[in-house]
Structures are given as structure tokens and as C-alpha cells.
Design a protein with these regions (language model features):
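Membrane-interfacial alpha-helical segments at the cytosolic side of multi-pass membrane proteins
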Residues: 49-70, 107-119, 159-171
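Small-residue-rich segments of transmembrane alpha-helices in multi-pass membrane proteins
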Residues: 79-80, 106-109, 132-138
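Cytoplasmic-side transmembrane-helix entry/capping segments in multi-pass membrane proteins
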Residues: 69-76, 98-103, 123-130
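N-terminal TM1-TM2 helical hairpin plus the immediately adjacent luminal interfacial "cap"
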Residues: 1-97, 143-149
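Membrane-interface micro-motifs in multi-pass membrane enzymes
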Residues: 93-116, 153
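Residue-level signal for well-ordered alpha-helical segments
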Residues: 4-5, 9, 61, 121-122, ...
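C-terminal transmembrane module of polytopic alpha-helical membrane proteins
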Residues: 23, 69, 84, 88, ...
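Short secondary-structure boundary/capping segments
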Residues: 17, 120-123
């Protein structure tokens, strides 16, 4: 990833998600990294850009409507759930991964659920921007584009938001 560009593979090995994690922090630290060993630098930047296009607009929308606390809960839930899913999908292998895509999909899911209530507030340009991002996010769910493991990790982000949303509704008595 970007860290390995400057610090070599040792940093990547220490912080990435692992199919066989050696340290507890690897369930979380891989979310804060991007790319993979040997990936071309352009791929790292494209991956980071696409994640940013999900996280910034939809995360901001979520924070405005649900508050910072719920955004943090969604972030942590998506991070941990995607790490666990990665672990179970790859436990027979010895591989590593990095990325924040599950958090992005959790935020997009929340945004898609919130947008209809806010649609009138947006200009036509902003509406088209959100529709484009939702379409792009949908494309990245296709296994033919991202592969099955990535698709399932992206889906874990969707499930994460739904778990937090359903849990918060249950705690408030369904209000």
C-alpha cells in the first residue's frame, strides 16, 4: 500500500488484515491502509479515490442526519465485521488485504436510506452526483469487476449499516 511505498513490506505485514491474524489490532488497522503488496501505485490511488467518493459525501450526509456517534458506531461495526468476514473467507489461505470499502458501503447504505427524506434540499447537480455515486457503488458490487471476496466484504458493509440502523431503532422503541 501507500505505507509500503515508503516503509517496505514489514509495515504492510504488521498492519494489514490477515487471513491468519497474529495481532488483535489487525482486525482494525487494515481499514486505515490501502492497496496490496505489488499493486501498481495507480491502483492504490484509484482505490483510495473510489473509497473517498463513497465515504466523504455519504459519511457527511450521515453525520448531518444521524450524528457523529452513529457514524463512529457504523465505522467500527463495518471495520470489525468486514475483518471477521475476510478472516472466515480466507482462513485456508495465507493472504493479506487492506481497505476501507466496507465502511464506504455502510455509509452509502445509510445515505441511500436518508436521501429520499432530503431530496428536495439538493440542487439538480447534487442529485446527479449522488445518483452517479450510487451507480458506481453498485458496479463495484459485481464480482466480475471486484472478485468474490471483495464483493462479500462490500456486502458486509451494507449489513453493518443495517445492523446498526435496526439496533438503534430497537433501542429507541422503534421510533
Amino acid at each position: 500500500g501507500l505505507l509500503t511505498s515508503f516503509n517496505g513490506d514489514a509495515m504492510y505485514d504488521l498492519l494489514a488484515f490477515h487471513s491468519k491474524p497474529a495481532y488483535a489490532w489487525q482486525y482494525v488497522s487494515g481499514t486505515l491502509m490501502h492497496g496490496s503488496k505489488g499493486a501498481p501505485i495507480w491502483f492504490l490511488w484509484v482505490h483510495l479515490l473510489l473509497n473517498g467518493l463513497m465515504i466523504l459525501p455519504f459519511g457527511g450526509l450521515l453525520e448531518r442526519k444521524r450524528g457523529s456517534r452513529q457514524v463512529l458506531i457504523v465505522f467500527v461495526t463495518a471495520t470489525v465485521l468486514s475483518s471477521i468476514v475476510f478472516h472466515f473467507l480466507t482462513q485456508e489461505q495465507d493472504i493479506q488485504a487492506t481497505g476501507i470499502s466496507a465502511v464506504g458501503y455502510a455509509f452509502v447504505t445509510g445515505g441511500v436510506l436518508i436521501l429520499p427524506k432530503m431530496w428536495k434540499e439538493f440542487s439538480l447537480t447534487v442529485k446527479w452526483f449522488y445518483l452517479f455515486l450510487i451507480f458506481l457503488s453498485g458496479l463495484m458490487l459485481l464480482p466480475v469487476i471486484t472478485g468474490w471476496i471483495s464483493t462479500l466484504l462490500h456486502l458486509s458493509g451494507i449489513v453493518s449499516y443495517l445492523l446498526v440502523f435496526i439496533g438503534s431503532k430497537g433501542l429507541k422503541g422503534g421510533s
